[in-house]
């Protein structure tokens, strides 16, 4: 059971952290640059600040298999964090988290079919996630980001976006496209796509150079 709460995007608030000016996209910024929130795009970039919450139930295998509720997904997770300030554009933080999750669960990386990216749309995050995914996965996955559509929720974004992806797959059988893409892209999706059968990889990042993969 997923319980979602999404609140209208907040505008006029700008986050400037990690020394990256204009890390988030505000209404004023959009008007000045003609850019719209998006990720992995050569024209549109950045994100609005959003609010939202999600409630999910996590159980061990023993209890999950006994529950009357239908099992939606199983997961294994790993995190890579340091005390450094800033995001490495070489993708090493994401790469360590991805490999940690793969090795912990003993998953064949070639069987990862869908990636829910952190997808803030900042230039540094685009470079970091692309680099990490290019060096760890095969070229047979599709990737999406929800932040251009719902904003960057503070704290709830990783779980909320993962649940939105699972719900979309359940309802439509497709991975949602990244909003405001300006070019055709079959990997970092410019249109809703039915994925091949396989695992889902969910990526997240936080302040203080913290990276998570599940």
What is the role of each PLM region?
Residues 1, 97-105, 132, 136, ...:
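Stable alpha-helical structural segments in soluble proteins, enriched in small hydrophobic residues
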Residues 1-63, 155-214:
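Conserved beta-strand-centric core segments of catalytic alpha/beta enzyme folds
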Residues 21-25, 29-105, 111-114:
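Condensing-enzyme catalytic core mediating Claisen C-C bond formation in acyl metabolism
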Residues 74-75, 143, 200:
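Conserved beta-strand scaffold positions in the cores of enzyme catalytic domains, especially
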Residues 84-94, 121-137, 153-160, 191:
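Short glycine/threonine-rich loop-to-helix capping motif typified by GTGT followed
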Residues 118:
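Glycine-centered flexible beta-alpha turn that most often forms the glycine-rich phosphate-binding loop
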Residues 139-151:
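Conserved phosphate-binding/catalytic loops in two-lobed NTP-binding clefts
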């Amino acid at each position: 059971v997923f319980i979602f709460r999404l609140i209208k995007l907040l505008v006029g608030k700008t986050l400037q952290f990690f020394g990256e000016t204009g890390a988030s996209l505000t209404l004023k910024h959009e008007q000045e640059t003609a850019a719209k929130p998006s990720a992995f795009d050569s024209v549109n970039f950045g994100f609005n600040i959003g609010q939202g919450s999600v409630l999910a139930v996590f159980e061990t295998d023993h209890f999950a298999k006994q529950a009357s509720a239908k099992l939606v997904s199983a997961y294994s997770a790993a995190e890579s964090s340091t005390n450094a300030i800033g995001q490495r554009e070489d993708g090493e933080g994401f790469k360590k988290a991805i490999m940690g999750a793969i090795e912990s669960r003993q998953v064949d990386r070639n069987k990862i079919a869908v990636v829910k990216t952190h997808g803030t749309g900042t230039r540094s995050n685009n470079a970091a996630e692309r680099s990490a995914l290019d060096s760890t996965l095969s070229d047979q996955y599709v990737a999406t980001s929800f932040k251009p559509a719902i904003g960057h929720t503070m704290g709830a974004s990783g779980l909320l976006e993962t649940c939105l992806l699972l719900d979309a797959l359940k309802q439509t059988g497709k991975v949602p496209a990244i909003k405001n893409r300006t070019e055709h892209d079959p990997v970092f999706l410019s249109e809703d796509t039915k994925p091949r059968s396989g695992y889902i990889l969910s990526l997240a990042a936080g302040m203080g150079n913290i990276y998570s993969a599940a």
